[in-house]
């Protein structure tokens, strides 16, 4: 539960009512650690939405109540706590069915939103590009469409804030047909954006510069690592989903190979299917990458659970079999004994600190090693000055060590991937 915020961009805050178990979960023997981990993660989600938590109501039950998720007795408890804490919004840690949402809105004094809507709200806060904003609005409308009953009445009572970003009050009060038309329009606009993205990717692929994608659970430190390796200055925040729109920057490895480093949106437990679908184009950077850096917060007690969740999402994206380097970040928060234990783990994990720079040189060498299927080679080329595209391709994918001009020819001494040199073998000259 939350009180009103001092933050200027937030008009109302939240009541956190947690029904954080799936039907039958208690009967399956869910551990106390797993439950507490879920509670802590949910608190962080609420805070990442810009909210102040005023109170919590927790519940562990064997089966979800079909009408209200938490049962009539618990509904009364939540209502009493919401009223006493003057909460504006009640946030559930589970997803609610349309029936449950309608019944809870009728029974409780504040606006009711569920886990997926909370995550969508956070995404709406961080979308900056046109594609990102279109994706968020599409995901919100598709999720809201079957849940329209009663929403207009609740929306009219709030001036904005958590659960109200993206599609506005008027939008959500329109009939199903109008929202369906808007969904159709958004899909068309996104398709246009995706065609442009596809064309840009095809131009990139014309010059064989490999892509290395950062993946990982939200708040594992991907953006901090991206900044440390590229100096790009991308927003790095302790809040969840600070990075929404993908970022691409070129870096040079110790072998002088150039690669593109991609920073992508973080994953999370029970990532809403509407988000995976809407953000599929963004996640194509993961699908197209030659190597994945699976960034993990090694100081987290739930690292193994988060690792498994990321593996699951990668498999859903069709990227589960891609070469991966496990990057154990935030090693500076561990004792020397704990650090040594990490290095002896399976799969040759790389223990680093993106914040201090510890282990980053070793990580770059490891990326080099992972890309050795296309080794860097030295070559001498004799290229007509009219072949500017050839010279540009060499500069983009490799390193020109020496350049000399003779008439209309350019003599180049280069270091580049073997595949790139192979494309221009007709310009090769014998070593002097």
From Swiss-Prot:
Under InterPro entries, the record lists:
G_HFLX_dom, GTP-bd, GTP-bd_M, GTPase_HflX, GTPase_HflX_N, GTPase_HflX_N_sf, P-loop_NTPase
Q: Which Gene Ontology CC terms are recorded?
A: cytoplasm
Composition bias, Low complexity: 1-10
Which cofactors are required for activity? Answer: Mg(2+)
Q: Which UniProt keywords apply?
A: Cytoplasm, GTP-binding, Magnesium, Metal-binding, Nucleotide-binding
Which cysteines are cross-linked by disulfides? none
Question: Region Disordered: start and end of each range?
Answer: 1-33, 154-173
Which residues are listed for GTP binding in this entry? 216-223, 241-245, 263-266, 329-332, 353-355
Subcellular location per the Swiss-Prot or TrEMBL entry: Cytoplasm
Indicate the quaternary assembly: Monomer. Associates with the 50S ribosomal subunit.
NCBIfam families attached here? GTP_HflX (TIGR03156)
- What protein name does the entry list? GTPase HflX
Name its species.
Answer: Acidobacterium capsulatum (strain ATCC 51196 / DSM 11244 / BCRC 80197 / JCM 7670 / NBRC 15755 / NCIMB 13165 / 161)
